[in-house]
UniProtKB/Swiss-Prot annotation:
Protein name as it appears in the record: Diaminopimelate epimerase
Positions bound to substrate: 13, 46, 66, 76-77, 166, 199, 217-218, 227-228
PANTHER family: DIAMINOPIMELATE EPIMERASE, DIAMINOPIMELATE EPIMERASE, CHLOROPLASTIC
Superkingdom as given in the UniProt entry: Bacteria
Organism: Herminiimonas arsenicoxydans
Pathway: Amino-acid biosynthesis; L-lysine biosynthesis via DAP pathway; DL-2,6-diaminopimelate from LL-2,6-diaminopimelate: step 1/1
Similarity comment: family membership: Belongs to the diaminopimelate epimerase family.
Location, primary (coarse class): cytoplasm
GO molecular function list: diaminopimelate epimerase activity
Length: 283
């Protein structure tokens, strides 16, 4: 089976994007893993699939597969790549589109300066809906947020727990560059209190309008940027009284801009999307 693809990235978070409107695809988890492999495949953090919509009132269906072959609910940086792809391929002539995902509808739009803004919807703040098992835990309040203790290697990490369509655990660190992201990230991802696993964010506060962030992504490991992780970190920081919107998020792959007006308001994610190359692969 030969598949045409486009390699893209958003702030270094890289993707293989596949048009499933004009070609038929039927991949196994092993084939997704092969496609993501940086030595034997194309190489990517996630694979993004463009499909015809199934729901009424939307323009496209957006599906996301992690490097481990598992399908996931949401990817903010990928949403920007998705918009650039459907625009460049002339699959739409709209500046703003409605896109169906596993976790609901998102509304990305192409800005005049070439940046792309994605309305990521309102965060989910109820632990049980993330999901996160709070049984037997004693939480503490910080500002409007609730912090939960998580035991990692015998040490207590105080985390914010929320969902941006996918689950996130966010903690504040003194120095993001030297935080044990890979060592602790995998333990947080697979912690038994997260039945669907979790994305682990390590946030350093620079000032009230700027943070440095590293994210260990569920099913992908540490990536150069994570859009939903940036949104989750900003929501956590604002609710804790540490940040004020808008916020610049420095990732290892570039800068993202996040705006959030508070509980029940949508989180707006703005950043770049870049096409690297196009190709064809036999699977």
């Amino acid at each position: 089976m030969k598949i045409k693809f486009t390699k893209m990235h958003g702030a270094g978070n890289d993707f293989v994007v596949i048009d499933a409107i004009n070609q038929s695809i039927h991949f196994t988890p092993a084939q997704w893993q092969h496609l993501a492999d940086r030595r034997f495949g194309v190489g990517a953090d996630q694979m993004l699939v463009v499909e015809k919509p199934q729901a009424a009132g939307v323009d496209f269906r957006y599906r996301i597969y992690n490097a481990d072959g598992g399908e996931v609910e949401q990817c903010g940086n990928g949403a920007r790549a998705f918009v650039k792809f459907v625009t460049d391929k002339k699959l739409t002539d709209k500046q703003a589109i409605r896109v169906e995902t596993m976790s609901g509808v998102i509304e990305p739009r192409l800005e005049a300066n070439g940046q792309i803004t994605v309305d990521m919807g309102a965060p989910i703040l109820t632990p049980e809906d993330v999901p996160f098992d709070v049984s037997g835990l004693l939480c503490k309040a910080e500002g409007a947020d609730t912090l939960w203790p998580l035991d990692i290697k015998g040490e207590t990490h105080w985390i914010s727990v929320l969902s941006m369509g996918n689950p996130h655990a966010v903690q504040v660190v003194a120095d993001a560059d030297h935080a044990p992201v890979r060592e602790d990230g995998v333990l947080i991802e697979h912690h038994p209190r997260f039945p669907k696993r979790v994305n682990a964010g390590f946030m350093q506060i620079i000032d009230p309008h700027q943070i440095k962030l590293r994210v260990f992504e569920r099913g992908a490991g540490e990536t150069l940027a994570c859009g939903t992780g940036a949104c989750a970190a900003v929501v956590s920081g604002i609710r804790r009284g540490l940040l004020a919107s808008p916020i610049k998020v420095q990732t290892r792959g570039g800068e993202l801009s996040i705006a959030w007006a508070g509980d029940n308001s949508p989180v707006l994610l703005t950043g770049p999307a870049v096409t690297v190359f196009e190709g064809e692969i036999e699977l």
